[in-house]
Amino acid sequence: MYAVVATGGKQYKVSEGDIIYVEKLEAEVDSTIELDKVLMINKDEGLVVGKPVVEGAKVKAKVLKQGKAKKIIVFKYKPKKDYRKKQGHRQPYTKLQIEKIDA
């Protein structure tokens, strides 16, 4: 069984036991959260597609870690004009482990 959930403006295909990295969620480490924007579920009986979400479906996940991704460098410059701007950015993320898919 797998499900497609939406969080942080992205969609993720998840199964029970999967570990995913999502955009930062306001939750404590080792707490359990519910992702209720379930767009699709593939069960033994068949495929259930929501319009736009599946009614009554939830995905329970455990928060494993709150962290920051690897740093990316943004470098802007204009040739011949002595304009250089270097900036770094680390995107915050939340590491989740999928515990249960309720359909």
Curated annotation (Swiss-Prot):
Pfam families: Ribosomal_L21p. Transmembrane segments: none annotated. InterPro entries: bL21-like, bL21-like_sf, Ribosomal_bL21, Ribosomal_bL21_CS. One of its GO terms (cellular component) is cytoplasm. Keywords: Ribonucleoprotein, Ribosomal protein, RNA-binding, rRNA-binding. It comes from the Bacteria. The keyword Chaperone does not apply. GO terms for biological process: translation. GO terms for molecular function: rRNA binding; structural constituent of ribosome. SUPFAM superfamilies: L21p-like. Belongs to the bacterial ribosomal protein bL21 family. This protein binds to 23S rRNA in the presence of protein L20. Part of the 50S ribosomal subunit. Contacts protein L20. This is Large ribosomal subunit protein bL21. The gene is rplU.
